[in-house]
């Protein structure tokens, strides 16, 4: 077992009840284009087209063969584009139950699958996009081969769902998915879970179960990869979350694309925080209807630390999101707030009374201060368990020095790995976008 000592479990109120219930009825779903790093779509549908579940909506021009399929049958009602014609979302109004079917196999046949059979089924169904590479966090090329594959069956994000509850509902499909992934390549498949967690796993020669313990980010794939099989500019691994593994298992055993999702609907502004069953790409305005408290709220697709604001053309559940978090918009300014004792405020440092409290806090979106230069007071080191020097790395990211940032380990990271550094930063700097700029530049320059 690998134990993480550095990190932070955010004391936020609104934790979900770990019981799965049906969410609100969803009549509209969407695929979000900006979730896929570096993707340039070649559209296969236009507004007004009627599509089946599993039908190709667009293909990646930069990565031929990687297709993105419809999560539901219905009519394409909108194709939203942003600045520079960047694809924001393809919206489908759900109608009917028509779907495209794919190859299916018996349990015995799963153990005899070839890598080519696995690739063909995953790519045809669009489930290939559930896999991501490290470094760069991109959907892998159709002919690429990883050194190893990481299955993340744990979660330490604030307000997260317990993977045990969800996996136990689909244990056979989860094991089938692990079997399929083990046939994808000859290297190791690492199943990463929390210490003593009841996560089923089949007896497969190249499956290795690893346990992690400690505060967040102990449950992030970046942490698992760093401690088990670190990457480099020439060494790539792939990773996938546990709910997508279940979807892979159902695809290969039933021949149908499974787009169901169990997400944590939680946060200080949620009336009844719990786990809800919904669909991939669900309209979050519909999912959160009558579920949130009065006031101006921000709905987040994903974690409060690293999720994306869901509004307008991107008001939908993300491809990789396992949470829907709701916070109050913190627009009110506090008179002389800097001099108050701050009993109802949380801080990692001993600057407010809330630091010494054991209670949970109603966090808002307020920054509690203005943006300024980096202040190296040791805050980053307290929440960074990886074997890197965070202050120097973050300085290089802010300065745009990609050579030094690469030497300090930025290739191992994704935006979510720096989310805690952003949270504790005295200068209120956003390090996720800076990391992405550096990674894009490194990849472009080779």
From Swiss-Prot:
UniProt key word Amino-acid biosynthesis: no
EC number(s) given by UniProt: 7.2.1.1
Record-level Gene Ontology MF annotations: oxidoreductase activity, acting on NAD(P)H, quinone or similar compound as acceptor
Domain of life of the native organism: Bacteria
Biological process according to GO: sodium ion transport
UniProt keyword annotations, A-Z: Ion transport, NAD, Sodium, Sodium transport, Translocase, Transport, Ubiquinone
EC class name: translocase
Gene3D superfamilies linked to this entry: 2.40.50.100
HAMAP family registered for this protein in UniProt: NqrA (MF_00425)
Quaternary structure and interacting proteins, as annotated: Composed of six subunits; NqrA, NqrB, NqrC, NqrD, NqrE and NqrF.
Family named by the database record: Belongs to the NqrA family.
Chain's role: NQR complex catalyzes the reduction of ubiquinone-1 to ubiquinol by two successive reactions, coupled with the transport of Na(+) ions from the cytoplasm to the periplasm. NqrA to NqrE are probably involved in the second step, the conversion of ubisemiquinone to ubiquinol.
Name of the featured protein: Na(+)-translocating NADH-quinone reductase subunit A
Organism for this UniProt entry: Pasteurella multocida (strain Pm70)
Organismal lineage: Bacteria, Pseudomonadati, Pseudomonadota, Gammaproteobacteria, Pasteurellales
Protein encoded by which gene: nqrA
């Amino acid at each position: 077992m690998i134990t993480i000592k550095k990190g932070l479990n955010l004391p936020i109120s609104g934790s979900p009840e770990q019981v799965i219930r049906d969410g609100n009825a969803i009549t509209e779903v969407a695929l979000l284009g900006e979730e896929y790093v570096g993707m340039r779509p070649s559209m296969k549908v236009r507004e007004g087209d009627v599509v089946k579940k599993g039908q190709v909506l667009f293909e990646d021009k930069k990565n031929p063969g990687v297709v993105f399929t419809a999560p539901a049958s219905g009519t394409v009602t909108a194709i939203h584009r942003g600045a520079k014609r960047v694809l924001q979302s393809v919206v489908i109004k759900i109608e009917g139950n028509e779907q495209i079917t794919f190859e299916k196999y018996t349990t015995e046949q799963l153990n005899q699958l070839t890598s080519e059979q696995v690739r063909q089924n995953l790519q045809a169904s669009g489930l290939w996009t559930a896999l991501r590479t490290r470094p760069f966090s991109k959907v892998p090329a159709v002919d690429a081969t990883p050194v190893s594959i990481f299955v993340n069956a744990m979660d330490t994000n604030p307000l997260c769902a317990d993977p045990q509850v969800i996996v136990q509902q689909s244990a056979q499909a989860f094991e089938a998915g692990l079997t399929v992934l083990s046939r994808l390549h000859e290297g190791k498949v690492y199943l990463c879970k929390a210490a003593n967690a009841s996560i089923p796993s089949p007896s497969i020669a190249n499956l290795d179960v690893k346990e992690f313990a400690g505060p967040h980010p102990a449950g992030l794939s970046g942490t698992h990869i760093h401690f088990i099989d670190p990457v480099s500019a020439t060494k790539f691994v792939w990773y996938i979350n546990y709910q997508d593994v279940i979807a892979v298992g159902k695809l290969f055993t039933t021949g149908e694309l499974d787009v169901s999702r169990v997400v944590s609907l939680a946060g200080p502004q949620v009336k009844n925080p719990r786990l809800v069953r919904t669909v991939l790409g669900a309209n979050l305005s519909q999912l959160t209807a009558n579920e949130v408290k009065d006031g101006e709220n921000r709905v987040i697709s994903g974690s409060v630390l690293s999720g994306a604001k869901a509004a307008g053309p991107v008001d939908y559940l993300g491809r990789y999101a396992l949470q829907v978090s709701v916070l109050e918009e913190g627009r009110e300014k506090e008179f002389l707030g800097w001099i108050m004792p701050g009993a109802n405020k949380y801080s990692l440092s001993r600057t407010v009374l809330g630091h010494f409290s054991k209670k949970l806090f109603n966090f808002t979106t307020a920054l509690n201060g203005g943006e300024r230069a980096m202040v190296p007071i040791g805050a980053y080191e307290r929440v960074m368990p990886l074997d890197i020097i965070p202050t120097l790395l973050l300085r290089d990211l802010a300065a745009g020095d990609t050579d030094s940032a690469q030497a300090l380990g930025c290739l191992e990271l994704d935006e979510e790995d720096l989310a805690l550094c952003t949270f504790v930063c005295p200068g209120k700097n956003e390090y996720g976008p800076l990391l992405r700029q550096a990674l894009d530049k490194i990849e472009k320059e080779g």
